[in-house]
């Protein structure tokens, strides 16, 4: 009985933490634009929910660079990157969406996080295997178009 008296209050302390994570995760949903130093748009990342999955696209101009539709449960799924099939795993680590992408023998880890400002997102790109460079992309939330909800 004593173990239950100790475990229950400890469990109650985690409820607000889990609620905060859910709120922070919801902030990832939307269209995000990466800009260069002059403020010109470089690429657009769109994060959408589709049933129990996340649908993520990355476009440069009118060309779609990558498209992934995956449940953020850690299960492997397929997507496309630069016109090639890729294997992807996504999961949440607290409020951060972690994406592992395998394209051929290269493996890249991306961490999508909305920081203090809800209109700014960072994507930390970390090469695990391969010659890609580490970088942190800074993106600004794009205004919703009149037709989207």
Q: Whereabouts are the PLM-identified features?
A:
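Alpha-helical interaction segments
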Residues: 4, 21-23
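Bacterial N-terminal signal peptides
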Residues: 6-16
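Edge beta-strand at a domain terminus
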Residues: 20-21, 66, 71-72, 120-122, ...
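Short, solvent-exposed loop/hinge segments that bridge or flank secondary-structure elements
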Residues: 23-65, 99-100, 104-109, 131-133
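Contiguous, well-ordered beta-strand patches that form the walls/edges
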Residues: 35-38, 62-116
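Hydrophobic/aromatic beta-strand elements that line small-molecule binding cavities or substrate pockets
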Residues: 43-48, 87-90, 108-116, 123-125, ...
């Amino acid at each position: 009985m004593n173990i239950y008296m100790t475990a229950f209050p400890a469990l109650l302390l985690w409820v607000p933490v889990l609620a905060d994570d859910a709120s922070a995760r919801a902030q990832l949903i939307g269209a995000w634009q990466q800009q260069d130093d002059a403020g010109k748009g470089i690429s657009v990342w769109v994060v959408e929910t589709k049933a129990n999955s996340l649908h993520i696209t990355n476009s440069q101009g009118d060309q779609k660079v990558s498209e992934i539709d995956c449940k953020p449960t850690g299960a492997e799924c397929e997507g496309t990157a630069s016109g090639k099939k890729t294997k992807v795993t996504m999961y949440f680590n607290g409020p951060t969406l972690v994406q592992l992408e395998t394209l051929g023998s290269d493996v890249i880890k991306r961490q999508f996080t909305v920081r203090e400002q809800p209109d700014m997102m960072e994507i930390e790109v970390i090469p695990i295997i391969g010659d890609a460079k580490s970088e942190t992309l800074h993106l600004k939330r794009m205004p919703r178009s009149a037709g989207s909800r």
